[in-house]
Design a protein with these regions (language model features):
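Generic secondary-structure microfeatures
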Residues: 43-47, 80-88, 106, 110
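Oligomerization/assembly interface segments of phage tail-like spikes and tubes
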Residues: 70-90, 131-145
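Acidic-leaning, charged glycine-interspersed low-complexity segments
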Residues: 95-152
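Short, cationic low-complexity segments
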Residues: 154-169
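Short secondary-structure capping micro-motifs at structural edges
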Residues: 63-71
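Short, charged, solvent-exposed linker or helix-capping segments at domain edges/interfaces
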Residues: 53, 148-158
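Hydrophobic beta-strand residues in large extracellular and virion-surface proteins
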Residues: 11, 15, 23, 80-84, ...
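Small/polar-rich, solvent-exposed N-terminal microdomains that initiate assembly or binding
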Residues: 1-63, 165-169
Length: 169
């Protein structure tokens, strides 16, 4: 799974765990059927920081096999778009209420490897394409990824967002 997809999934999960509704991708048709406010999480900007290449962090022994693995890290800066849509029945207040849930989730419920740097909220406006109210927001993050390599291997394992475990697609 790509680094950006791992971050988007972590953000969607944090919002859902806080009681909000969030999706990684969306269509206007899908949103029109929703009775709740929905946050669409997308990638706006991604930067591998100059020092974001492979950084040697040390060694870790596997608890089960006692095999020693080298641990490397990678750092990324990214900005996500967080477009919050609310049906006409909820009004602009539906976006505002959902934005509060999103902000709370992003300040308190993210995995260890994802640190919120900044968050910006725009004004709620009527979106003609979806026929819903929309509040455009963005969140800037520092993301930290880890990978391991066994002593006898020359290939690195996949980089995984710190604090999320080894998810596979």
């Amino acid at each position: 799974m790509t680094a950006v997809k791992q971050v988007k999934r972590a953000v969607v999960k944090a919002i859902a765990d806080a009681g909000g509704m969030a999706v990684e991708s969306y269509s206007a048709e899908k949103f029109r059927m929703s009775e709740r406010a929905v946050t669409a999480v997308g990638a706006r900007e991604t930067v591998i920081e100059p020092r974001g290449g492979f950084e040697y962090l040390g060694q870790r022994a596997d608890e089960k096999t006692q095999e020693v693995r080298e641990v490397y890290g990678r750092r990324m800066a990214l900005t996500l778009s967080l477009d919050i849509y609310a049906p006409r029945e909820l009004g602009a207040d539906g976006c505002e209420t959902a934005a509060e849930t999103v902000m709370q989730a992003l300040m308190t419920a993210l995995p260890e490897g994802l640190r919120l740097r900044e968050m910006q909220l725009g004004q709620t406006e009527w979106d003609k394409v979806t026929g819903m109210f929309r509040l455009c927001a963005s969140a800037g993050y520092a993301a930290y990824f880890l990978c391991e390599r066994a002593e006898d291997e020359t290939v690195f394992t996949d980089f995984v967002l710190k604090g999320t475990g080894k998810e596979r697609e």
